[in-house]
Amino acid sequence: MKRELKVKPIENGTVIDHISGSKALKVYKILNIEEKLPITLALNVPSKKGVTKDILKIEGLELSKDDVNKIALISPDATINIIKEGKVIKKFKVDIPKRIDGIIKCTNPNCITNKENIESRFSIEQKNTLKIRCEYCEKFINSIIISK
C-alpha cells in the first residue's frame, strides 16, 4: 500500500511556488528567515508542466519588495501566494525589475561599490537570459552574489 505524506497548509504567511528545481534552498538562504518560523520545504516535486519544481512555505512571514526581487533573480518563474486565515488573499508571479539597488554585490573588485560605502545599482539589460550590468563600473556580472 502506497503511503502519502500530507503537509498541513499554513494559516498566515507566504507560499513560494514554482521555484526552479533544486533552488529552494538558495531562496531560503537569501531570505534570512528567522529560525523560529515554521517552514516547509519541498524539493523536486513533479509539476503539471512535466518538470520538477520546489515549494517553500513560511508561516508568519511577509515578503518585502527586496525579497521578491531576490527571488526573481534566482527563480524567475516563481509564484508568490500570500495566505491570511488559511486563504490565498494575493497571488502573483515574480518579475525581474529593470533596476536593482543594494541587493546584489558587484563582482568587479575594482568597482567603487566594493571600495567605498556606496549602495550597488544594477540595470537588467536582458531578462530571458539574464544580463545584469553594474551602473557604476559598467561590468556585466555572470554570477549573482546577494549582498544582504
Swiss-Prot record:
Its cofactor is Zn(2+). One of its GO terms (molecular function) is metal ion binding. Keywords: Metal-binding, Pyrimidine biosynthesis, Zinc. One of its GO terms (biological process) is pyrimidine nucleotide biosynthetic process. Binds 1 zinc ion per subunit. Zn(2+) binds at C106, C111, C134, C137. Pfam families: PyrI, PyrI_C. One of its GO terms (cellular component) is aspartate carbamoyltransferase complex. Signal peptide: none annotated. InterPro entries: Asp_carbamoyltransf_reg_N, Asp_carbamoylTrfase_reg, Asp_carbamoyltrfase_reg_C, Asp_carbatrfase_reg_C_sf, Asp_carbatrfase_reg_N_sf. Contains catalytic and regulatory chains. Involved in allosteric regulation of aspartate carbamoyltransferase. Belongs to the PyrI family. PANTHER family: ASPARTATE CARBAMOYLTRANSFERASE REGULATORY CHAIN (PTHR35805:SF1). This is Aspartate carbamoyltransferase regulatory chain. It comes from Methanococcus maripaludis (strain DSM 14266 / JCM 13030 / NBRC 101832 / S2 / LL). The gene is pyrI.
